A protein has these predicted regions:
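Metal-dependent nuclease catalytic cores that hydrolyze phosphodiester bonds in DNA/RNA
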Residues: 1-78, 108
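Mg2+/Mn2+-dependent nuclease catalytic core
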Residues: 57-154
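Conserved pre-motif I regulatory segment
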Residues: 173-220
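A substrate-engagement module of RecA-like helicase motors
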Residues: 178, 185, 243-359, 367, ...
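Signature of the SF2 helicase/ATPase Hel1-core->accessory helical subdomain module
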Residues: 231, 237, 258, 341-358, ...
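A contiguous, basic/glycine-rich beta-loop/short-helix subdomain that forms a polymer-engagement track
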Residues: 334-359, 369-376, 502-622, 629-632, ...
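Conserved RecA-like P-loop NTPase helicase motor core
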Residues: 619-630, 681-793
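Conserved helicase motor "Helicase C" RecA-like lobe of SF1/SF2 P-loop NTPases
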Residues: 655-680
């Protein structure tokens, strides 16, 4: 029997953790601050103190061989010659309330490390020391207990005996899982064209010899071939061969999570003996069973019965779920279990994930530096990553590593705090004055209406004279300054320093006044401050600082222009990663921005008959901003020709809501007999579903929907058959020119000379190709794609067309379009 690998912390917390979920403000970033203080205490201990000592040992309980491992915070020999295991804990608990028996888990960790080290070194006795560091007062309290090795070994053995039934359950499951996955058959009678090739690529990536940074694969596969099953099936087969312990299916939106759930359900339906546990991770706000009056989770034991006593009941809930035999733990199943056992569904799904084989969730569970799953990704593991709709990852990753802070947050906090003097009020005022001076500096550097710009001094700094109320402030040299926005390559330390100084008094106030009326507003401010300060710690040459003056407000953004090193680091936590989409063109662009320059990239051709797709372009229409007014009428005429060619459902995609609205108003005035439907901004899930329901099969009347490229209907929508028989794409999808996009352009111009491509052309054409992919979804589908813009005839854009667009026809005018459409539908 293979040894059961068991981290010390997992063993101790699983068995001994008790009590409730309590998300009240604790005053510090536990992970980052705790690690910093650990290093501080370890360094202060001096010579002879060994820090972060890796320990591993073999033990047996109930016939199960265990490998127990972990890192002891410190090991040293005291003046009496006794070996001491030091366990360091950082706490916000007031020093007077810190007790020796405050947390049994703390002693247990030290005692297990003592057992491992004692046997390893042949010691007869050891001491275990708990070192508590109080983060507000810097008080250090230490407690020491004396043990014989025999006592420590007995303690560890007792823990293992308690854990053994859980280990046995998991070992039996893994054996059963391995047998079933190795024999898993493809759940359909035959592969669709292209599916076998895609599955083969993914299987080879997952079973390749592990490397330090993991194997990377980029797969472009046409819409409609069944990508979800084509990547899931081979990855699961790889796990069946022993290549991979868990599979993480990561998505950009909920709709693709459902696709993964459905694919796994299909595998279960086709194989009644399939042993597979899957869990879908859903945001806390969406699964909360006991929100407060404003609809937000209230994770306090005195307010939520599902938080109160959670750790006392969660293992009972886990046992019931793991033994129920279904293995499918989606949102509905978890809600039922949470109600049955009175446990928080969000924390339950996280705890359950450690016992599951497939984990389905948003990108942020792997890539976001704040909310990623530390239990899996703080160190590398035998994980397989499937990244769906990977064309969305560059922008999502940029957003995850960026941060913003507004002066208005300080103003609102001051207002909420009210009158009176306090340390916090003073710190708020200093930060507010710094941002006020920053706003004035930006307004001078980047005047909106003809004001003269300031000049740099010899140091490269921009200095502005202040006043008694508003002191002078220095900003780094501006790399870009226009229309109220300034970009700097260096951090604006003059703005960040007062925010850093605000942290301590803000923490103190939040801890001391938890019931104050202003608590919610100041807690929001605290998190905003922490967010921007964390981003400042990551800040390097891949970032730019954006300062924007809007009226009386100043917005500071630390923008991640290039997320490649951060994505690379996240993917390195696993064995292999397959990133797939219908649109990963050009592949070099995606490999570069996602930190995988050496990754293998494959592009599969469309399996669908070319004659089923009518593909036309009217290059006589220009949708450039200056020609938009002149383009409205010709676009309406082209849309009318498309929608009148055959009764059915159509979609027209535009680069913006404003442009959409202009054309829609003209179209409905001139073609009132054609039914229309407009995508409104900010649609929720219900609104999205209602919109799509209008695209019914076998329509008796024509419906023309107006949507936005890159929006919720421009991708991730499956309208097969005659639910959608045509779409028009207005423009080449270029992002709107903005200071941010210009900084992206400048950055990549400096990197590789392709700034316009990286910032505008390639992201825009991705939206075009995604929108066009809504039309042909199955082998039997027949439909039309109409391109409306003269730039589609330019080689820089045409070279980005997929191979199955070789038959694209460029037409002279609407009259010729009508004839082509008539002929297409007559065939």
């Amino acid at each position: 029997m293979p040894a059961f690998r068991l981290p010390v912390r997992q063993l101790v917390e699983f068995l001994l953790r008790t009590g409730s979920i309590d998300s009240r403000f604790t005053g510090f970033d536990r992970a980052n601050e705790g690690a910093r203080i650990h290093r501080k205490l370890q360094k202060a201990a001096g010579e002879g103190y060994a820090a972060e000592v890796f320990l591993s040992g073999e033990r047996e309980a109930a016939g199960i061989p265990f490998t127990i491992e972990g890192r002891a915070d410190g090991i040293f020999t005291d003046e009496a010659g006794v070996t001491v295991i030091d366990e360091i804990k950082t706490t916000a608990v007031p020093a007077d309330d810190i007790a020796e028996d405050m947390n049994p888990c703390h002693w247990a960790q030290g005692m297990v490390y003592g057992a491992l080290y004692g046997r390893q070194q042949g010691l007869e006795k050891l001491d275990v020391r708990l070192t508590y560091y109080q983060i507000d007062t810097d008080d250090i309290l230490r407690f020491v207990r004396h043990f014989t090795l025999e006592e420590l070994e007995a303690f560890l053995q007792d823990l293992l005996e308690q854990y053994a039934p859980w280990a046995q359950r998991q070992l039996a499951w893994k054996e059963r899982r391995g047998v079933s996955l190795s024999a898993l058959d493809f759940p359909f009678p035959a592969y669709r064209p292209g599916q076998r090739a895609l599955a083969g690529e993914v299987y080879r990536a997952c079973t390749a010899a592990p490397s330090k940074s993991g194997v990377r694969l980029f797969c472009q596969a046409p819409t409609g071939i069944g990508k979800t099953m084509s990547v899931l099936f081979p990855a699961l087969r790889a796990i069946g061969t022993g290549c991979g312990e868990k599979l993480f299916y990561l998505t950009a939106r909920n709709t693709t999570q459902s696709a993964a759930e459905d694919a796994i359900a299909r595998l279960r339906a086709s194989d009644s003996k399939l042993a597979l546990r899957s869990v879908t991770l859903t945001a806390k706000e969406k699964v909360c069973l006991h929100p407060d009056a404003e609809g937000h989770p209230a994770c306090l034991p005195e307010l939520c019965p599902y938080a109160n006593g959670y750790y006392d009941r969660v293992n009972t809930a886990l046992k019931a779920l793991l033994d129920d035999g279904t293995g499918r733990f989606d949102r509905a199943a978890l809600a039922d279990a949470a109600k049955q056992f009175t446990v928080c569904p969000f924390e339950l799904e996280l705890d359950l994930s450690e016992w599951c084989d497939v984990i389905i969730g948003d990108y942020n569970y792997l890539f976001d530096p704040v909310v990623h799953l530390r239990r899996f990704f703080d160190s590398a593991g035998d994980w397989l990553f499937l990244v769906d709709e990977a064309h969305n990852l560059p922008e999502r990753a940029r957003a995850m590593y960026s941060a913003r802070f507004c002066k208005s947050s300080l103003t609102e906090a001051k207002r909420a705090l009210g009158r009176g003097k306090s340390t916090l009020k003073t710190a708020l005022s200093k930060a507010d004055k710094a941002f006020l001076a920053g706003r004035k500096a930006v307004s001078t550097l980047a005047p909106r209406r003809g004001s003269t710009a300031a000049e740099e001094d010899d140091s490269g700094q921009t200095s502005l004279l202040g006043s008694a109320e508003t002191p002078a402030i220095e900003l780094p040299a501006a790399d870009y300054a226009q229309d109220g926005t300034v970009f700097c390559k260096e951090l604006p330390s003059a703005l960040l320093a007062p925010l850093r100084a605000l942290t301590a008094p803000l923490q103190d106030w939040l801890e001391d006044d938890p019931d104050a009326e202003a608590h919610a507003a100041l807690l929001d401010l605290y998190f905003e401050v922490q967010d921007i300060l964390r981003a400042s710690e990551r800040y390097d040459e891949h970032f730019a600082a954006q300062l924007t003056a809007r009226g009386s407000d100043l917005e500071l953004q630390l923008l991640c222009l290039d997320p490649s090193p951060f994505v690379d680091a996240s993917l390195s936590a696993g064995r292999a990663a397959a990133l797939f989409s219908a649109t990963l063109t050009p592949p070099g662009y995606y490999r570069t921005v996602l930190g995988c320059p050496e990754a293998r990239a494959v592009a599969l051709e469309s399996p669908f008959p070319a004659e089923n797709l009518g593909l036309y372009c009217l290059p006589s229409i220009s949708t450039r901003y200056r020609q938009r007014d002149a383009s409205i009428r010709p676009i309406s005429d082209a849309l009318a020709a498309l929608a009148s060619s055959r009764v059915g459902n159509y979609l027209a995609f535009f680069p913006s809501y404003a442009y959409l609205r202009q054309v829609w108003e003209d179209f409905t005035a001139r073609y009132p007999d054609i039914g229309t439907l407009v995508q409104e901004s900010g649609l929720d899930d219900a609104g999205r579903a209602a919109f799509l329901e209008r695209f019914s099969p076998c329509p008796e009347k024509t419906l023309l929907g107006f949507g936005v490229m890159g929006g919720i209907f421009g991708e991730g929508v499956d309208l097969a058959g005659d639910r959608l028989i045509g779409c028009a794409i207005v423009g080449v999808g270029l992002p709107q020119v903005s200071p941010r996009q210009e900084m992206l352009r400048r950055y990549y111009d400096a990197q590789n000379g392709a700034g316009f491509d990286y910032a505008y052309r390639w992201p825009g054409m991705n939206k075009v190709l995604q929108a066009a992919g809504r039309v042909i979804r199955t082998q039997e589908d027949k439909g039309v794609v109409l391109l409306l813009d003269d730039r589609f005839a330019q080689s820089e854009y045409a070279r980005l067309f997929p191979k199955h667009w070789r038959h694209l026809e460029y037409l002279r005018d609407t009259k010729e379009l009508k004839k082509k459409l008539e002929d297409f539908w007559a065939e």
